[in-house]
Amino acid sequence: MKIFLLRHASPDRNHTDIPYDIPPGPPLSSKGKKEAAALAVFLKTQGVVKLYYSPFERTVKTAQIVSASNDIPCVEEIKLAEWRGEHETEIHVKARMKSTFDNAFRECAEIGPIGLVSHGGPIDVLLQELGINKDELAIYKTKFDTTNPLPPAGAWEVERNENNHSWNLNLKFIPPTT
């Protein structure tokens, strides 16, 4: 049973008039569309059968590109939304992300691997909740953009250990640079 924690592909940062952390947020850049297409190829090799995505434009489009390429359903899930900064505590982000993860994990036992398309901050909080310590995450953050534990259109694979009490967490996909 696998869950993939997926960060949206690269947004178009030229839209400075569009707030980044308030829906809809900026659309994908042309680079982001290519990253999402590469993510689709990877997820097909992993047998992902369903996606849930945040309601932000960049996550919606990432999910739509993957869904169309792989002919799998995708469903909006508000709990995967971007961290709302000062309006939302880390405890709240952790609770909503863990709730969504737990529901998806139960579902993947019945249907197969599922992808959750979200944002770097919420994925960071969830990875810590699942057992990665902050020092290890800091190493990943230095590889990307100092605040995110995975690149745009990157994927963490989450599997239950044999003892059923902990998780195997692996950064499985980094899109090729273009």
Residue map of PLM features:
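Short hydrophobic/aromatic-enriched beta-strand-loop microsegments
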Residues: N70-I78, D135-T142
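Acidic, low-complexity terminal tails and accessory targeting/binding regions
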Residues: F42, E86-I91, E110, Q128-T178
